[in-house]
Regions:
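Glycine-rich phosphate-binding loops that contact phosphosugars or nucleotide phosphates
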Residues: 1-47, 51, 56-60
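Short, amphipathic alpha-helical interaction segments embedded in low-complexity terminal/linker regions
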Residues: 51, 56-142
């Protein structure tokens, strides 16, 4: 098929590792409860997948520094979290973050760019598009 493949195995020299283009092997040793694969091995695999997905999210512009800036507000808790993220990323107070989020129609990335670049929503959206979704690149544009 020509697809690039990756694998995660919790044993050294596993069969799947030999078949994958990018094998990840982490030796967790035997499980405390023989026959179970959900304890050490399952936890290790979950941690690896979390690291891979986090790196991917940052790579495609969903993160800025250590902040998840591409958060969708689906409830009050996430709305408050997004406001806090905008405040931290833009170095502004709550009132300014709320105002920018309102003007940006809830788009945290656009709100951050609006504040840091001192521009309106349309210009911020344009800058974000030109920067391929990356807030830092958008802010650095002149």
């Amino acid at each position: 098929m020509g697809c690039v493949t990756a694998s995660i195995a919790c044993n050294h020299n596993s069969v799947i590792s030999k078949e994958a283009d990018y094998p990840i092997e982490v030796e967790t040793g035997p499980e405390i409860l023989t026959g179970s694969t959900r304890l050490k091995a399952g936890t290790a695999q979950k941690m690896i997948l979390n690291m891979v997905s986090t790196a991917t999210m940052v790579g495609i512009g969903k993160g800025n520094e250590n902040l998840m800036v591409d958060l969708v507000r689906t409830n009050e808790k996430l709305e408050a979290r997004l406001c806090n993220i905008v405040m931290e990323a833009a170095g502004c107070d709550r009132a300014r973050a709320v105002q920018a989020l309102s003007e940006a129609e809830g788009n945290g990335k656009v709100a951050i760019i609006m504040i840091l670049s001192e521009c309106g929503r349309l210009k911020a959206e344009e800058k974000l598009k030109e920067a391929r979704g990356h807030v830092r690149r958008a802010v650095m544009q002149t």
